[in-house]
């Protein structure tokens, strides 16, 4: 069974690149352009990893991650953002063990980071 990744990223081009890179690495990826839609899907089926941008319409990535890990405490979370400081702020409600990949990044780095998280 391939591991499933839920991707929330509001930038269409970025979302397409990420899906392509992760599928090529052997993952099954479902992607959404906002946090609210991603959360609705998460309530329907389990995922191994939530990969989310932080700044998005309707529900930001930190809120999405908070709600998602309430729903499934075993869900791993990775933020992809240009605002790494926001996710790493200890006062934020981001899950403590979430990892952060700052934009810009190479797709290879993303895949390596995802592989590491899902192997843990």
Which residues are covered by each model-predicted region?
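C-terminal output helix
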Residues: 105-115
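Charged docking surfaces used in two-component/phosphorelay signaling
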Residues: 13-24
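Receiver (REC) domain active-site loop signature in two-component systems and cognate sites
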Residues: 56
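Acidic catalytic/metal-coordinating carboxylates
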Residues: 34-37, 60-64
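Conserved acidic carboxylate
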Residues: 9
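Active-site residues of response regulator receiver
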Residues: 53
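Short hydrophobic/Thr-rich beta-strand motif most characteristic of the beta2 strand and flanking loop
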Residues: 26-33, 41
